[in-house]
Amino acid sequence: MASDLDFSPPEVPEPTFLENLLRYGLFLGAIFQLICVLAIIVPIPKSHEAEAEPSEPRSAEVTRKPKAAVPSVNKRPKKETKKKR
């Protein structure tokens, strides 16, 4: 019985160039996704020079007129009538 067992490695074909390209491309994609998720989670401290410049445009945003008030829930918007041809 022991002589009947075959312990030789299975015959597996070598991966082709496209299979290798797909494999390593998927690895690179996964690493890129991890870097993107970490960039969102981990905040990066800004330098003092970068903080001074954005403060100027913010003051311009404050001077803008506020948007129109949201219409009340009870009022229905007017229906636009289609032109008859």
Curated annotation (Swiss-Prot):
| Compositionally biased region (Basic and acidic residues) | 48-64
Q: Which UniProt keywords apply?
A: Membrane, Transmembrane, Transmembrane helix
Entry GO CC: membrane
State its location(s). Membrane
Membrane topology note: Single-pass membrane protein
Q: Identify the Pfam families for this entry.
A: UPF0239
TM helices/strands, residue ranges? 24-44
Region of interest (Disordered), ranges: 48-85
Residue stretches of biased makeup (Basic residues):
75-85
The UniProt similarity line reads: Belongs to the UPF0239 family.
Quote the protein name from its UniProt record. Answer: Protein MANBAL
Q: Which organism is it from?
A: Homo sapiens (Human)
The gene that this protein is the product of is MANBAL
